[in-house]
């Protein structure tokens, strides 16, 4: 750990974009994996399309890409959602990325279905993945990219709801939401400016 009197060297030109979710095919198309879907959209936009590779030191799948001329690390932790903080902190340390250059895409139960909102800093809104990241980074000063999935119907348990796959009838809406989220990342990094 760095001495409080010494400023840690950071690479402020590099950004870390993290897509939260759970690993494995069982969870691939669930509401809880929307963050991972956003990373997939960003990968597909690379020319040629980029792919993830395992970064063994951090137990994370990553791709190093350029967006708007900036070096960007796209990442999907290989851990379950609730313990995402460790890999995110390790990646930030490995690449020397400050918290203010980290964007975390996640599923938002409180957000209207399909709504995308980017905000810097703030609370975790009860999201265990964000809680883990805040605890591991020791700060709230990272960006949150919420992807609205809405509340569960009736009395359905929210934990069961987020682990259900999106129905085929919502596929187009999910694709649009992921595209909107990727657009928001690109705007933040300077695409179109």
Curated annotation (Swiss-Prot):
Keyword Disulfide bond: no
One term under GO cellular component: cytoplasm
Major place of residence: cytoplasm
Function: Hydrolyzes ribosome-free peptidyl-tRNAs (with 1 or more amino acids incorporated), which drop off the ribosome during protein synthesis, or as a result of ribosome stalling.
Site (Discriminates between blocked and unblocked aminoacyl-tRNA): 22
Keywords from the UniProt entry: Cytoplasm, Hydrolase, RNA-binding, tRNA-binding
UniProt-recorded name of the protein: Peptidyl-tRNA hydrolase 1
Alphabetical GO biological process terms: protein quality control for misfolded or incompletely synthesized proteins; rescue of stalled ribosome
Catalytic reactions on record: an N-acyl-L-alpha-aminoacyl-tRNA + H2O = an N-acyl-L-amino acid + a tRNA + H(+)
EC category name: hydrolase
Family named by the database record: Belongs to the PTH family.
Binding site for tRNA: 27, 80, 82, 128
Residues marked Stabilizes the basic form of H active site to accept a proton (site): 107
InterPro entries xrefs: Pept_tRNA_hydro, Pept_tRNA_hydro_CS, Pept_tRNA_hydro_sf
Pfam families attached to this UniProt entry: Pept_tRNA_hydro
Domain of life, per lineage: Bacteria
Active-site residues (renumbered): 32 (proton acceptor)
MF (Gene Ontology): peptidyl-tRNA hydrolase activity; tRNA binding
Keyword Heme: no
EC number: 3.1.1.29
Cell compartment(s), UniProt: Cytoplasm
Quaternary structure (record): Monomer.
């Amino acid at each position: 750990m760095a001495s409080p009197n010494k400023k840690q060297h950071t690479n402020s030109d590099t950004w870390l974009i993290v897509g939260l979710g759970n690993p494995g095919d069982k969870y691939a198309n669930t509401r809880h994996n929307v963050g991972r879907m956003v990373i997939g959209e960003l990968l597909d936009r690379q020319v040629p399309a980029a792919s993830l590779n395992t970064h063994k030191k951090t137990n994370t799948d990553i791709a190093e890409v350029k967006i708007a001329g900036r070096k960007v690390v796209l990442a999907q932790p290989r851990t379950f959602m609730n313990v995402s903080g460790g890999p995110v902190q390790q990646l930030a340390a490995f690449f020397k990325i400050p918290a203010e250059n980290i964007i975390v895409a996640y599923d938002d139960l409180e957000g209207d279905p399909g709504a995308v909102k980017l905000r810097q800093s703030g609370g975790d809104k009860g999201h265990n993945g964000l809680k883990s990241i805040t605890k591991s980074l020791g700060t709230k000063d990272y960006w949150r990219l919420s992807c609205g999935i809405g509340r569960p119907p009736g009395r359905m348990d929210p934990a069961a709801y987020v682990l259900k796959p999106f129905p085929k009838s919502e596929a187009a809406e999910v694709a649009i939401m992921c595209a909107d989220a990727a657009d928001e990342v690109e705007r933040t990094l300077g695409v179109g400016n």
